[in-house]
Amino acid sequence: MEGALAANWSAEAANASAAPPGAEGNRTAGPPRRNEALARVEVAVLCLILLLALSGNACVLLALRTTRQKHSRLFFFMKHLSIADLVVAVFQVLPQLLWDITFRFYGPDLLCRLVKYLQVVGMFASTYLLLLMSLDRCLAICQPLRSLRRRTDRLAVLATWLGCLVASAPQVHIFSLREVADGVFDCWAVFIQPWGPKAYITWITLAVYIVPVIVLAACYGLISFKIWQNLRLKTAAAAAAEAPEGAAAGDGGRVALARVSSVKLISKAKIRTVKMTFIIVLAFIVCWTPFFFVQMWSVWDANAPKEASAFIIVMLLASLNSCCNPWIYMLFTGHLFHELVQRFLCCSASYLKGRRLGETSASKKSNSSSFVLSHRSSSQRSCSQPSTA
């Protein structure tokens, strides 16, 4: 049921098209059918994901635009991660939703290749911008004096977007509009070698999931160690401050006290941002693990239940990661959304006040005009009456 997959590449289509292009073994005589009940579930799930991703990330971008702290490095990375999640919603979830509604891809070959290319761009961008944000937090905690400057941040984000555009290029060559049955065309993958689907999906799994997760684990391992070390220093500083003066009178006591006081302790704000990025990473792992597990299973096991409902629905849930991130931002940076709500309420109040003033002014003009007209008409009537003398 190739049209029901929410993946950026169709595992079933890949398996079906493993033979050389033009081979007749991949075509069927009659028109393929699908489970309409399952298709309705897929459409409902994708509609919900699309609505949540669009509304949530649009609110994040609007909140970041209206906040007073526009030059925060964390907010800079949040902005680009929200843009990447919007790319996932618009160019991955929306095309798949339309595809599930129509069952077949209706469009030219160029559109087929473009859609499949943009679907993977969103995946790569969302993953590697999250990785870049985590590296930034790691540098901010472990080496605050060497943390990236604003210009370097922009260059790193630009390089990440360009790298994602390049890494997604194989999609253009793999997918094309081809005949899958007599007179039936669809946007399917074509692999020249039988091992092509295994190699390609394994590479995507390594590039988008396994390698980033390893790097993220290393980053947060270093961050955890640094925070633990910092807590020890805070405890030592508190103990040194409470100790009697005579206890630190010796040279060793003075050296230890100087060492503790010279260490720059990590602020609570930095720890809060680390918690936020850690939860985002955890959501990334939870959302993507079932998807890649199912993808690898589908190409490495010939007996995988590719038509099972649970198997297909799991593939749809990968895009949930783009829905989760805005709620995580709201949890840890609630002031952003509070400012957005306040701005919205102020604008609404100003609009309603202006509208009431406009209506009042129009009403006064109307009353004044009616008074003048009635006064004139009464004057004319009094002048036109004949004299009784």
Swiss-Prot record:
Coiled coil: none annotated. One of its GO terms (biological process) is female pregnancy. The modification Phosphoserine is found at S366, S368. Glycans are attached at N8, N15, N26. This is Oxytocin receptor. Disulfide bonds join C112-C187. The keyword Cytoplasm does not apply. GO terms for cellular component: plasma membrane. The lineage of its organism: Eukaryota, Metazoa, Chordata, Craniata, Vertebrata. Residues 1-38, 98-113, 176-202, 295-309 are extracellular.
